């Protein structure tokens, strides 16, 4: 499938991207930072009024890394496009610095080749069709936090109640896929730590 790549277990690689939601009357521009685990398809999304390296790092710090820590795992690498919110001088760029501090490898999509991050593109399309189009028909949002509350409800349902046909999901929910592969991920991480100690 186009946009798919090899991933070994939950936490092995996540994909992150920015999704421009639009301009809301009385609110202004709304951007979504999106993260999806490329193995289990567990997703996270947080809304902002701008797209910057700080907002990109905030999603990881506020939602993504605490989730992995809660399950005794680490995020090993992340795939992004080459947008300015993700790429810059590693010594001064807040997102690049955050990844370095958290020891997360950073892979970038090929230039002018967004389909290499196709997993997150498909996720955005699903969100647009199943959440945003419906939400904006039903309600006028006065604040980003109001929209975030409804998005969080949808995200919980997506992760915990909706069967997924992803490569490793086999019709299970993303969260069930994540939990089922949890032991594999922990064994892989322990094995990599042991190998690193032997090589040191």
Give, region by region, the residue ranges found by the protein language model:
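Buried hydrophobic side chains on well-structured beta-strands
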Residues: 41, 78-80
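RNase H-like two-metal-ion nuclease catalytic core shared by retroviral integrases
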Residues: 80-82, 86, 92-99, 106-130, ...
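Short small-residue beta-strand/loop micro-motif enriched in glycine and branched aliphatics
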Residues: 42-46, 107-109, 133
């Amino acid at each position: 499938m186009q946009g798919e790549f090899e991933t070994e277990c939950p936490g092995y690689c996540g994909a992150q991207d920015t999704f421009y939601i639009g301009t809301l009357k009385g609110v202004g521009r709304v951007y979504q930072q999106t993260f999806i685990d490329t193995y289990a398809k567990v997703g996270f999304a947080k809304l902002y009024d701008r797209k910057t390296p700080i907002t990109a790092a905030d999603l990881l710090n506020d939602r993504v890394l605490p989730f992995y820590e809660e399950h005794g795992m680490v995020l090993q690498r992340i795939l992004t496009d080459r947008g300015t919110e993700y790429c810059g001088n590693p010594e001064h760029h807040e997102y690049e610095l955050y990844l370095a501090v958290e020891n997360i490898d950073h892979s970038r999509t090929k230039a002018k080749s967004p389909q290499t991050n196709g997993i997150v593109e498909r996720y955005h399309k699903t969100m647009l069709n199943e959440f945003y189009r419906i939400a904006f028909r039903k309600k006028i949002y006065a604040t980003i936090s109001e929209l975030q509350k409804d998005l969080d409800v949808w995200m919980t349902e997506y992760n915990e109640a909706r069967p997924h046909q992803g490569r490793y999901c086999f019709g299970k929910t993303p969260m069930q896929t994540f939990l089922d592969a949890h032991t594999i991920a922990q064994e892989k991480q322990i094995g990599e730590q042991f190998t690193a100690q032997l090589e040191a």
